[in-house]
């Protein structure tokens, strides 16, 4: 039996508190409950993946994700990680509805295999970059003091792109944006407005117009409309002076093809938890062939769980927008041995 065959695996559920409540148009949480998955090859090499469901995937409870990962681990025993694609495709075929679990399994498998070959995931993806800068997310808080404090803290840490959650009442969204802008204006910040499916075409355009008139530089409008509203997204993409990103509506290469054909976005936001790593490359290929730009986001992964996304970003160099800040939003976490953060800067170790 080859040294790259899967020998064992472990699954564990753990909860981590957030620095501040995470609030979007879809809900609110004060902690994240993730599932860690470790896989060990016969030669002793280990790989790690982490399943973290977002508020958009609230039906995926940790116990359900853990059960799926345990099943995937059992089916992988004795299989050769040096031939990962059949295992990965089987995981997604069986558990496409539990995407974060399938993705965590895939990440652990590819992490173990590349390590066994003396490679990092970033090197396997192409080794394009050593470092890059991420944005920072500011939740849909209604407390102006909390918003101001979070924005000021992030600015002091060096962040210059602020992703602000919107999608509630227009007045509340504008008040939040103005609070952030007032706190960081001297830095000439850029803004990403994340609607989390909570806006309409008209309200999105009014929000963008108000932000422009207030002097804000809006770089991107992320998934403002419901994920099934391709027609509305196409209209908004056509009418908006700001690039529009598809997030929740793209989980697979087929979804990306539909976005391209219906001209439903000018940017596609890839998340490893939605698509895994190999399908992320396929989605990127579709977007790049159609001259769409790419964003790479995350759920609520720890630093270790975010490692595959960091390596995907830096290894490929494909992404115009990086939203890899989940580790920075946690109250406490252990740094990953495979990358490090200095404020917005993420870099390989």
Cite the ranges covered by each PLM segment.
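Catalytic domains of carbohydrate-active enzymes, especially glycoside hydrolases
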Residues: 153-165
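Metal- or metallocofactor-binding catalytic centers and their adjacent structured scaffolds
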Residues: 3-6, 10, 40-116
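Short Gly/Pro-enriched turn/cap motifs at secondary-structure boundaries
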Residues: 25-30
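Catalytic core of soluble alpha/beta enzymes
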Residues: 164-307, 330-342
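Flexible C-terminal active-site loop/helix
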Residues: 4-18, 34, 262, 299-349
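Short, structured patches in soluble enzyme cores that scaffold and shape functional sites
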Residues: 13, 136-140, 165-168, 195
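Short, charged beta->alpha transition segments
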Residues: 119-124, 144-152
